Amino acid sequence: TDSLHFEEYGNRFHESHAAQIAQSPYLNFTSLWVLFDFPVAEREEGIVDSDNGVDFVVNPERKYLNDKGIVTRDRKLFKDVFYLYKSWWNKDVETVYITARRLKYRPANQEFVMTVYSNAPSLKIYCNGVEVAESTKTEEPTGVVWKFNVKMVTGPTVFKAVSPNGTSDEIEILPLQD
């Protein structure tokens, strides 16, 4: 039983799961585990939180909780991966969503891969208001998982993803202090 259940790990798991489903048109039925977090007696895993991947804090509210849902138990927080499925399954509503938004700190001047879930035909990425990347398609099998190489700046960094229709999402990441 592991005390660390990072949302980003869940994202990678579901991205892989969805890609396999998209590449298997012969499947008559597919499902995901599970829509909502739910209580489980005698469970003490996934109880540690971190907003920087370095410092960890025990969160007693997550004790006795299966936290693998795509929405929290109280239905207040739609986890990143919820937007993967929203982008993939709902083509009527354009979605643009930057993942890893609860990982609020990263090392300054470091490059990293930013993931965006979107059913838009193309995306532009801005860093502090300056366009830094553009893509007209994703090679990923579901067609909704976009990866962009971006770089943190020295101070607070605001990344914004924008579709041609103006649908957008943005996150602010702060520099990790040594």
Where are these regions (language model features)?
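Extended substrate-binding grooves/exosites of carbohydrate-active enzymes
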Residues: T1-T138, K147-S168
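Edge beta-strands of extracellular beta-sandwich domains
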Residues: G166-Q177
